[in-house]
Swiss-Prot record:
Catalyzes the 2-thiolation of uridine at the wobble position (U34) of tRNA, leading to the formation of s(2)U34. The lineage of its organism: Bacteria, Bacillati, Chloroflexota, Chloroflexia, Chloroflexales. The record marks H126, Q354 as: Interaction with tRNA. It catalyses: S-sulfanyl-L-cysteinyl-[protein] + uridine(34) in tRNA + AH2 + ATP = 2-thiouridine(34) in tRNA + L-cysteinyl-[protein] + A + AMP + diphosphate + H(+). Belongs to the MnmA/TRMU family. ATP binds at A7, M8, S9, G10, G11, V12, D13, S14, L33, G125. It comes from Roseiflexus sp. (strain RS-1). It holds the Pfam family tRNA_Me_trans_M. It is an enzyme of class 2 (transferase). This is tRNA-specific 2-thiouridylase MnmA. It is found in: Cytoplasm. The active site is at C101 (nucleophile), C215 (cysteine persulfide intermediate). InterPro entries: MnmA-like, MnmA-like_C, MnmA-like_central, MnmA-like_central_sf, Rossmann-like_a/b/a_fold.
Length: 373
């Protein structure tokens, strides 16, 4: 029997994760991370930090008869996620704050706290799988001491069985020490199976709808947050075509992203898309749809799940956004955490600031941030 901390959002996925581990005989404790204090009705009730979701997690733990606690990580969330989010936008990148939340809060900080409190493992409701050597690890072998597991096992991170819900792209930053202490109990199930299993157990969260929003930007409209927190970053400037001709004016680089067509306020006689954000000139660059396609990119801050930097170029599948298809690519390792990636076919709207993740079939090799040219 292992002592397992389950990170619970109040949704059905983490609720079932807790239930499955409890049923398997483990000593399970549920925890919710309080990350963001919404004011002026910014925080919707369906979002992970809302009072309603916290109460949902509490009710599930009461049903299961397991302890439940709320950890306050607002200060860390502000520092590592919100400030990053604002800084990246102000610098002409399009960030993915959920990646930083996973990296700094949900895994780095929570794993450290779990270790301090004497827990063997942390479990979450993520749709992904961990394989120890050739043996799938989803909680069945959680009785092994973590130190022993880590010493004798190589861990691989895999896509979930449910490809529509797969979250492995968001977990590429996990390393061997992380995977040795993590459990993803629902990675082998489809979402429909998860809901059915939760309903069969009478879990209060069985039919709770999912939220697709960034937790501190309900509705996906980050512009108001930028206006409140970084008004200096919203400097008007020119919209330039590919020949450098001014075809309009923009209201601030952070309000635009690669591939955007709507809301440009320009009339050029043909559809025009944002192809680049030129920070040096404070200019939005636009061009035809064909100009969005890229055959290669450079990635920075690259890490590999194995913990080992590749010594030679390698072929893999590369995915440039959370819900994009992974396509064949060749990765050429560089220096200081950078790689060059050459695609087998041009990719549309490659966006600096987003993540690129490398796969070998279902296995996550690693990933990094797409750099600016």
């Amino acid at each position: 029997m292992a002592k397992i901390m389950v990170a619970m959002s109040g949704g059905v996925d983490s609720s079932l994760a807790a239930a499955l581990l409890h049923e398997a005989g483990h000593d399970v404790t549920g925890v919710t991370l309080h990350l963001w204090e919404g004011d002026d009705d910014r925080l919707a009730e369906s979002l992970c930090c809302s009072q309603e979701m916290t109460e949902s997690a509490r009710r599930v733990c009461a049903q299961l008869g397991i302890p439940y606690y709320v950890f306050n990580y607002q200060r860390e969330f502000r520092r590592y996620v919100i400030e990053y989010f604002l800084r990246e936008y102000a610098s002409g990148f399009t960030p993915n704050p959920c990646l930083e939340c996973n990296r700094e809060i949900k895994f780095r900080a929570l794993l450290a706290r779990a270790r301090t409190l004497g827990f063997d493992y942390v479990a979450t409701g993520h749709y992904a799988r961990i394989r120890a050597d050739e043996t799938r690890h989803n909680g069945e072998d959680a009785g092994l001491p973590p130190a022993e597991r880590a010493q004798r096992t190589t861990y691989r991170l895999l896509r979930a069985v449910d490809r529509e819900k797969d979250q492995s792209y968001m977990l590429y930053m996990l390393g061997q020490d992380d995977l040795a202490r993590l459990i993803f109990p629902i990675g082998e199930y489809t979402k429909a199976e998860v809901r059915a299993m939760a309903a069969a157990r009478g879990l209060a969260s069985a039919n709770r709808p999912e939220s697709q929003d960034i937790c501190f930007v309900p509705g996906g409209d980050y512009r108001n947050l930028l206006r409140e927190e970084r008004p200096d970053a919203l400097r008007p400037g020119p919209i330039l075509d590919l020949e450098g001709r001014e075809v309009g004016r923009h209201q601030g680089l952070p309000l635009y992203t690669i591939g955007q067509r709507r809301g440009l306020g320009i009339a050029t006689g043909q559809p025009m898309y944002v192809t680049a954000l030129d920070v040096a000139r404070n200019a939005v660059i636009v061009g035809p749809e064909s100009a969005l396609r890229r055959e290669s990119l450079r990635a920075e801050w690259v890490t590999f799940v194995s913990g080992m930097w590749p010594e030679a170029p390698f072929d893999c599948l590369a995915q440039i956004r959370a819900h994009a298809d992974a396509v064949p690519a060749r990765v050429i390792p560089g220096e200081a955490g950078t790689v060059d990636v050459h695609f087998s076919r041009p990719q549309r709207a490659v966006t600096p600031g987003q993540a690129i993740v490398f796969y070998d079939g279902d296995v996550v090799l690693g990933g990094g941030r797409i750099a600016r040219d």
